[in-house]
Amino acid sequence: MDSTTLVYADLNLARIQEPKHDSPPSLSPDTCRCPRWHRLALKFGCAGLILLVLVVIGLCVLVLSVQKSSVQKICADVQENRTHTTDCSVNLECPQDWLSHRDKCFRVFQVSNTWEEGQADCGRKGATLLLIQDQEELRFLLDSIKEKYNSFWIGLRFTLPDMNWKWINGTTFNSDVLKITGDTENGSCASISGDKVTSESCSTDNRWICQKELNHETPSNDS
């Protein structure tokens, strides 16, 4: 064997004996996938986050709605009070020649007649005979009457079959507020004179006191 053949054989041997480089093993498709419970946790987390956002939005809308409703109610109340106050300040006045006290108008009439005629005269003026509410109201009227010695009919009379004093509006007389002097019998009516409330015959001629409630109507000149 010559030298040329020997070199060729050596090259082939070297090529045959050259180590092979193995390619990296391929990974299975399941190797890169996350565990199943990770995916479930991610889904539930996203759902919970969305639900939380919706709850927050709903609460915000509810709070804004309640606040708006409260503001509207307050504004309506203020407007109503303002209107009522304006009406009271403008229209709540007694007619000319009538006295104003609390929520009533009073007038003392100087003509004399029976209790029935006095009540009828008050009715023609849109009023009634005096209904005394308490001692303070009685003191106000007594201070306003100049003729202390005269008697004035009030809206109180003795009724049958109740056998009791009653005001003309149907309420029962309260003896803790007023004390009535004099004889009481059928046909008795009450009058005030000085600081006393006296029982008299309803046919007696006395002066009288009328009263009417304050209202929202334009004051008139009742005579």
Swiss-Prot record:
Keyword Membrane tagged: yes
Record field: transmembrane: 44-63
Locus of motif LCK-binding motif: 32-35
GO biological process: negative regulation of natural killer cell mediated cytotoxicity
Tissue expression remark: Expressed in NK cells and a subset of T-cells.
Listed GO MF terms: carbohydrate binding; identical protein binding; signaling receptor activity
Disulfide bonds: 122-210, 189-202
Intervals, Extracellular compartment: 64-223
InterPro entries: C-type_lectin-like, C-type_lectin-like/link_sf, CTDL_fold, KLR_subfamily_B, NKR-like_CTLD
Subunit structure: Homodimer; disulfide-linked. Interacts with tyrosine kinase LCK. Binds PTPN6/SHP-1 in a phosphorylation-dependent manner.
Protein name: Killer cell lectin-like receptor subfamily B member 1B allele A
Highest classification ranks of the organism: Eukaryota, Metazoa, Chordata, Craniata, Vertebrata
